[in-house]
Amino acid sequence: MAVAAWLQVSPVIFLLLGAQPFPLSFLGAGPAPVFAADRSKWHIPMPSGKGYFNFGKILFRNTTILLKFDGEPCDQSLNITWFLKSADCYNEIYNFKADEIESYLENLKGKKGLSGRYQTSSRLFQNCSELYKAQSFSGDFTHRLPLLGEKQEAKENATNVTFTGDKIAMHEPLQTWQDAPYIFIVHVGISSSKESPKENALSNLFTMTVEVKGPYEYLTLEDYPLMIFFMVMCIVYVLFGVLWLAWSACYWRDLLRIQFWIGAVIFLGMFEKAVFYAEFQNIRYKGESVQNALVLAELLSAVKRSLARTLVIIVSLGYGIVKPRLGVTLHKVVVAGALYLLFSGMEGVLRVTGAQTDLASLAFIPLAFLDTALCWWIFISLTQTMKLLKLRRNIVKLSLYRHFTNTLILAVAASIVFIIWTTMKFRIVTCQSDWRELWVDDAIWRLLFSMILFVIMILWRPSANNQRFAFSPLSEEDEEDEQKEPMLKESFEGMKMRSTKQEPNGTSKVNKAQEDDLKWVEENVPSSVTDVALPALLDSDEERMITHFERSKME
């Protein structure tokens, strides 16, 4: 739980930190991973012997569950039993495991430790042909019965419960009675006939098809809000792209490399959201997911987050702002980005494919440690870069860093509040009754990231003054002054300098005293909230040398 919470807050810290000079970095750090819509249509081959099928979903009221059977004729007798149960707590279906079906059914019959209501019915078929003819259940239909001490209330209200009839046809749909989490279980008991050979005992006798359809076709109540959210996010990213293209077209001659990367991150985010929305639409109308589309979406998300973190590190190091090149540090940046791409891609693919669940959970651990190390690296680099900008007294670049750092502080505070809220509401409660709001746990982080991306776009928007953010080393100015000095001497050679009388008015002393006062204020008084928020870090020998070099040039 702690690892998952850190994975949610660390991307916010990470993106916000580095995205200051480089807006597109923000989008790359994705929040909590997306869990794509679950399928609502299954084709299950049923072998000889006893078999179970189950699913747990949050369903709309009047959602229909349709059972279909198809296969070759057989002489085996079949006993088909189904259970449909609603739950008051989402934990009951979330923690339900397939290998616990038999014990769960025993508790259901004994009404032990369960909540909600349930329906059940059973029918014996003499052979497969009888099953394929859509025979009906009769006599074994059980009314919905409340659990957990609500027997008396159920008896009083039993006469008010209405059904479509005394018999339910096997191929007729079952129907839910309220918006709630549901568990559906089908038990197929198959007895081999005496005439059938033993070697065919394990062969697939028939195929059972289960379909779940509600007001929005195959889309369930837990997936419908996320589909709407991804549709809105697609529109938002399209607007971001149009706005960025318009700015870039107006000032295309003065575009910086950073602004090209911002456009690339916007495009990746738009593409990622479109793939997820298309997957939800496919589930809605076909009931089955396209696994390749899910894998593509997860890989796009991993590339986007890795690119964002790499760019944030580069910008926090001052590349293009106070340094013309990174030198040997560039290799460290590339390795960090490659490692994050590897771990995030592995975790996403394992999660959406449903294979190796334990490995997918373990993939969170290296991601958490890597995010921690990268955040610490960004904090140190960002502090050093802001110190150099203060020494150079570059007000424009320093203001850019401060504005985004203030945004960072607010976003980190908001992320902490959201983590506390989601933990208290969804994770540590014994009965998760607010299942209607589960989609917010994923959507809130993506919404927060989009807001930060918009702030980055505003700070780094293309304009006529783009070059004010470009790297301008002080050494070039010194070289120009040195080249101008001998030319001035030759121009005025042979001319006499008139002596000027020094006026002892004390002006020089006053100016020197003012400079000393300003220097003391600059060194001892923090100039903004960012100086207080970012802790003072010990200067290394290399930092002292750089600081001394910058001061000597200014003097």
Swiss-Prot record:
Disulfide pairings: C74-C128, C89-C431
Residue intervals passing through the bilayer: 226-246, 258-278, 306-322, 326-346, 362-382, 404-424, 438-458
Chain intervals with Polar residues compositional bias: 502-511
Signal peptide residue numbers: 1-21
Keywords, sorted A to Z: Cell membrane, Cell projection, Disulfide bond, Glycoprotein, Golgi apparatus, Membrane, Phosphoprotein, Signal, Transmembrane, Transmembrane helix
Glycosylation site residues: N79, N157, N160
Disruption phenotype: Mice lacking Tmem87a are viable and born at the expected Mendelian ratios. Behavioral indicators of touch sensitivity are profoundly reduced while non mechanosensory modalities, such as heat withdrawal thresholds, are unaltered. This is associated with loss of sensory neurons mechanically activated currents.
Name of the protein in question: Transmembrane protein 87A
The keyword Amino-acid biosynthesis belongs to this UniProt entry's keyword annotation: no
Tissue-specificity statement: Highly expressed in sensory neurons responsive to mechanical force.
BP GO annotations: cellular response to mechanical stimulus; detection of mechanical stimulus involved in sensory perception of touch
Cytoplasmic face of the membrane: 247-257, 323-325, 383-403, 459-555
Lumenal side: 22-225, 279-305, 347-361, 425-437
Similarity comment text for this entry: Belongs to the LU7TM family. TMEM87 subfamily.
Membrane listed as a keyword: yes
One Gene Ontology cellular component annotation held by this UniProt entry: plasma membrane
Region of interest called Disordered, as start-end residue ranges on this chain: 491-515
Description of how the protein assembles with itself and partners: May interact with STOML3; STOML3 potentiates the mechanosensitive ion channel activity associated with TMEM87A.
Species of origin: Mus musculus (Mouse)
Modified residues (Phosphoserine): S540
Record InterPro entries: GOST_TM, GPR107/GPR108-like, TMEM87A/B_GOLD
Function: Potential monoatomic ion channel gated by mechanical force, implicated in normal touch sensitivity through the generation of mechanically activated currents. However, a direct channel activity is debated and an alternative could be that it functions as a chaperone for an unidentified mechanosensitive ion channel. Could also be involved in cell mechanosensitivity regulating cell adhesion and migration. May also be involved in retrograde transport from endosomes to the trans-Golgi network (TGN).
